[in-house]
Amino acid sequence: MSGIIGKNIGMTSMYDESGFNVPCSIIEAGPCIVLQIKTKEKDGYDSCQLGFDEKKYKNTNKPLLFFFKKFKSTPKKKIFELPIKGNIKSGNIIKLNCFHENELVNITGFSKGKGFQGVVKRHGFSGVGERSHGQHNRSRAPGSIGAGSDPSRVFKGTRMAGRMGNKKVTLKNRKILKIDLLNNFLIIKGSVPGAKNSYLIIKKLK
């Protein structure tokens, strides 16, 4: 299998073989059930849908209940689509035994949302002018956003204040330090995108 779905549990630290204290992230990954298999003949490409994290029946709408019933699965909170690697069939259970320690993986998730932020925090602007000689309220200002009557518009891509964070982020070549098959935990070196309990996709390198 090319990857697995996980949930960000939090961060801790552990000592490596050299005695260095290494920060690491704990991810609860799997077990995931294989739902729909998409083929090139029928859908135009090859992939499979994985379901992860149990969901209550009362919180699931009828179309989704019929969808999960079709593939003989209980309702799941998250469904992600991943490329197929190997002989995968609908109903198979994907666990962490497809990974091994010291393997490098790519981790995809959504970064923490920061809300509406100004240009100093969002883009690293320095503000306008010096903080002296009577200036007051310009220390975090964006400054000019363009010329006047020519071109009579603001160019696309001009860096301005706006919503920050909550973007799709992929961290590449993250090392697996330890695998806990009993509790379905992956210990990854360093940090991962998103807040606690946010969902992640852990992919093998191609």
Swiss-Prot record:
A Pfam family per the record: Ribosomal_L3
Signal peptide stretch: none
An annotated GO BP: translation
Gene3D superfamilies: 3.30.160.810, Translation factors (2.40.30.10)
Top-rank taxon: Bacteria
Region of interest: Disordered: 127-149
Protein keywords: Ribonucleoprotein, Ribosomal protein, RNA-binding, rRNA-binding
Gene Ontology CC, one term: cytosolic large ribosomal subunit
InterPro entries, sorted: Ribosomal_uL3 (IPR000597), Ribosomal_uL3_bac/org-type (IPR019927), Ribosomal_uL3_CS (IPR019926), Transl_B-barrel_sf (IPR009000)
Record-level Gene Ontology MF annotations: rRNA binding; structural constituent of ribosome
Ribosomal protein is among the record's keywords: yes
Role of this protein: One of the primary rRNA binding proteins, it binds directly near the 3'-end of the 23S rRNA, where it nucleates assembly of the 50S subunit.
Protein name stated in the entry: Large ribosomal subunit protein uL3
Organism encoding this protein: Karelsulcia muelleri (strain GWSS)
Gene that encodes it: rplC
